[in-house]
């Protein structure tokens, strides 16, 4: 939590602050060990934090999601030790986090791109997870860089996230429009 507070400002990550930080190295190493959860929010917070830490670690290792091949290496090929197994960021998102049935995760996990959700300057915590995810969702939906409404044509221009994960938003609210 202190590391995020010191190195994340308004969603902008100070990657050098993580590079040689012993606390960050210890946290990433700890992620490799099997995990136990006291409930759904504990599990969600753990996996969101793990995803974001591994996404940062990928950038620090020189992986870059800025090209098609770079995205494939970053999300689908690089395996990370997590909770007693090796897993890609893609599989962590699609096979572990998404099946937990919480669409707000799409506003919490980062993809190291300016078009993706901001990284919070605090860790996700089980006891405050709902409030944190609500805040992330509000910020993302109301961010004019990611979403905007043209009053003249009465047209909403939404982030691609709403298209990519439409089934998650529909499952939660019946439609993406109702979700928003």
What does each model-identified segment do?
Residues 1-180:
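Interaction/scaffold regions that mediate signaling and macromolecular assembly across diverse proteins
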């Amino acid at each position: 939590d202190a590391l995020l507070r010191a190195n994340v400002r308004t969603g902008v990550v100070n990657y050098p602050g993580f590079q040689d930080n012993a606390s960050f190295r210890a946290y990433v190493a700890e992620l490799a060990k099997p995990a136990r959860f006291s409930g759904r929010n504990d599990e969600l917070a753990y996996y969101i934090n793990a995803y974001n830490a591994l996404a940062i670690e990928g950038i620090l290792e020189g992986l870059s999601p800025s090209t098609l091949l770079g995205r494939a290496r970053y999300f689908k090929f690089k395996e990370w030790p997590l909770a007693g197994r090796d897993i890609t960021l893609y599989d962590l998102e699609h096979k572990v986090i998404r099946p937990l049935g919480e669409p707000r995760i799409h506003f919490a996990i980062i993809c190291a791109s300016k078009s993706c959700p901001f990284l919070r300057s605090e860790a996700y915590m089980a006891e405050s997870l709902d409030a944190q995810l609500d805040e992330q969702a509000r910020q993302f939906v109301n961010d004019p860089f990611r979403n905007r409404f043209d009053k003249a044509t009465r047209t909403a221009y939404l982030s691609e996230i709403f298209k990519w994960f439409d089934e998650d938003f529909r499952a939660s609210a019946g439609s993406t429009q109702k979700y928003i």
